[in-house]
Amino acid sequence: MVKAVAVVRGDSKVSGSVVFEQETENGPTTITWDITGHDANAKRGMHIHTFGDNTNGCTSAGPHFNPHGKTHGNRTDENRHVGDLGNIETDAQGNSKGTVTDNLIKLIGPESVIGRTVVVHAGTDDLGKGDTEESLKTGNAGARPACGVIGISA
């Protein structure tokens, strides 16, 4: 079992953690998040970005992690970036908790996401359905108010 965590924060009141767990290299990864301080009753994009570099804030994290050269999509789509996690949904206080299982995201092997950055976006991810070139790259999820590098945990 490999476990990893990203402590998410930035130049906003959005903060929290995203925990990853994977039993075997070919097995699925469980992703659990607890994010607070976002807009109330909203859907907000969350992605794994290529670089674990936050020296210039969350912008240094680069584009979505996309080792297979696919277009942007929903977490459940066959055609998507590995880093596409879709939207998290916030409650009336702007908080979001949830768990999903994903077959593309890996902690073990050459496409591991360890050392990369989780970004919580300011806008709703259109899941690549926005009919624009930008939609196919980013989902038009907007600014990056909070992020954190994924690190190995006990």
From Swiss-Prot:
SUPFAM superfamilies: Cu,Zn superoxide dismutase-like. Homodimer. It comes from the Eukaryota. One of its GO terms (molecular function) is copper ion binding. This is Superoxide dismutase [Cu-Zn]. It is an enzyme of class 1 (oxidoreductase). Cu cation binds at residues 47, 49, 64, 121. Destroys radicals which are normally produced within the cells and which are toxic to biological systems. Substrate binds at residue 144. Disulfide bonds join 58-147. The gene is SOD1. Binds 1 copper ion per subunit. GO terms for cellular component: cytoplasm. It is found in: Cytoplasm. Keywords: Antioxidant, Copper, Cytoplasm, Disulfide bond, Metal-binding, Oxidoreductase, Zinc. The keyword Lyase does not apply. InterPro entries: SOD-like_Cu/Zn_dom_sf, SOD_Cu/Zn_/chaperone, SOD_Cu/Zn_BS, SOD_Cu_Zn_dom.
